[in-house]
Amino acid sequence: MTEVSDRQAPHRRVPGPARPVRPGAQRRPGPGARPARRPVPPRKAAPPALRLGSPRPRLRMIGLALTLVLIAFVVRLLQVQAVDASTYAAKAEQNRYVVHTLPAERGGITDRNGVALASTVDSYDITADPTMFTREQLKVGDGPEQAAALLAPILGEDQEALAAKLRPKNKDLRYVRLARGKTPEVWNQIKDLKTALGKKADEDESAVNVLAGVFADPSSKRVYPNGSLAAGILGWVNSEGEGSGGLERKLDRTLAGEDGEIRYAQSGGRQVPTIGANEKPAVPGSGVELTIDRDIQWAAQHAITEQVKESKADGGYVIVQDTRTGEILAMANSPGFDPNNLSDADPAALGNAALQDAYEPGSTAKVMSMAAVLEENAATPATHVVVPNRLHRGDRLFKDDVDHPTWHLTLNGVLAKSSNIGTILATGQLGKTQREANQVLYSYLRKFGLGSYSGLGFPGETKGILAPPGQWSTSQQYTIPFGQGVSINAMQAASVYSTIANGGVRVAPTLVRGTKGPDGRFTPAPEPEKTRVVSEKTAKTLSRMLESVVDDEEGTGTKARIPGYRVAGKTGTANRVDPATGKYRGYTSSFAGFAPADKPRVTVYCAIQNATQGSYFGGQICGPIFKQVMEFALKTLQVPPTGAAPANLPVTFKP
């Protein structure tokens, strides 16, 4: 049985209502009661709680941004690894490997006998490090000046200019070029002096090697061993080694060759020895052999230079040509220039005036008028021509170079005495009307090469001026037959006489005989173009008429006679157009001819522009030049003297 307790559950005491405290009464603490607590001050009200936003939107934005960045990295990685992989691999390869150019050696230029006219030699650019000339380095304040004083006479440079380069305004400059293209001998001289100063400085502490900062960069240099000889033909190369004038420019691709290269791996700026280098050798340029004969060129250049000085002329030219082949044996200009030292050259003298100057030829052009008259059977050498002192044609009054009574000349005499009036009368027979005569004459002038380029392809060459007959003025209809109102260059004039000498066949002039490749094999130049201009009969008749100009006492070319040889030639004296004003001022004096007249080998043409001292007549100042150059050429080429006597054609007739 379950025991039942008789205890009752304790009852919770419920406090009754508090009794009111009487005024002045104090509550006494009972025994064991706790002491009364101080009253607790009322608590401050808590600030209202902030309502925090949800972090989820921010987390979404951050996640989205990180996703986009990751996508960009992935896209870029795909681009680098897949799309542009080859490009970057090539760049890496390029950065890893270094390529150096191996310059090709420029081919040389020689005359027809193998004599060097232009060649390439080793040279040095003299350089310096200006920081090695300071007071701190040399312990002296005038180091640049001392070095300049030693270098100036060796380099041929201005001492003050050298000192200025060694003391630049930029104190951090480490490289200056003191001189360009010096010979190995010059660098050896500087190097020996530098070594001597260095040895002295090692032995004596007070001594200073002021050349310690001078160095040299190996290079190459184009040299012309004969100086100004044939400079107008050869031209020159620029500082980059490229042809900039004459044949150096025209044949630049042939002469330059093909640069090679060497390619090797690098690391830290140094070649990696375990990885082989790939080398593509340079292909040297081909050598060029000219038709020029150096000795004949010298004779022509010397003769024209001396005569230009003596006559105080503006300039002049001489051309020597092989009548049979068209090869040019000499082409000389005065004034000239030295391609080794272009800084001292007159800019007006650069180029080749014999091909670039266009001028009115004067009476040397009468041979073409006579060729037309003979070829058209309008007259013969014996045809009578009555030449008055004055002749009215159109609105002009024409005269010869001298006053004279009425001349009774043969056609041969018209050419021998160089009569302008006689030439007008003769060419007037080329047609029933003056218009027809003009057209016939024009066709022959074109056949002789006037108004066309010579075929040399020379830079800057002029083709002259020959207007169609329909554009000829009234006066030109009568002046063109005697060489006024039409312009040519010296090469065209020489070619006219070579055509007559060659039996009426014009052979295009040539300057290049062939090229010699790096393998030493010679390749001849193409055969020149040949064109028949007049018949062989007409050419031979003209040749005999031209002999009268030189041999007959009444001829204008007596100063061109050469003992032992038959000479055919023609003088010319033309009013000259001043290039500066476009008006006539002075004269063009000329002489053209060939020898031996019976078996022509050589043609020589000479012209002088604006002679101001002595005679200006072509026969007087150019005849002697022709003789001097022709004699030299005939001897050089070993042409035997003439055996047959010259033909005597009548010059005058009795009315």
Locations of the language-model features?
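N-terminal targeting leaders characterized by basic, low-complexity, disordered sequences
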Residues: 1-35
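Small/polar-residue-rich segments within soluble enzyme cores
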Residues: 2-9, 146-153, 164-284, 606
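Hydrophobic alpha-helical transmembrane signal-anchor segments
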Residues: 2-8, 34-40, 53-87
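Short, small/polar residue-rich loop motifs at catalytic or cofactor-binding pockets
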Residues: 96, 101-105, 312-316, 509
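Beta-lactam-recognizing serine transpeptidase/beta-lactamase-like catalytic domain environment
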Residues: 266-277, 322-363, 368-612, 618, ...
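Conserved, well-ordered alpha-helix/loop/beta-strand core segments that scaffold catalytic motifs
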Residues: 272-316
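Short, gly/Ser/Thr-rich active-site loops of penicillin-recognizing serine hydrolases
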Residues: 522-528, 623-655
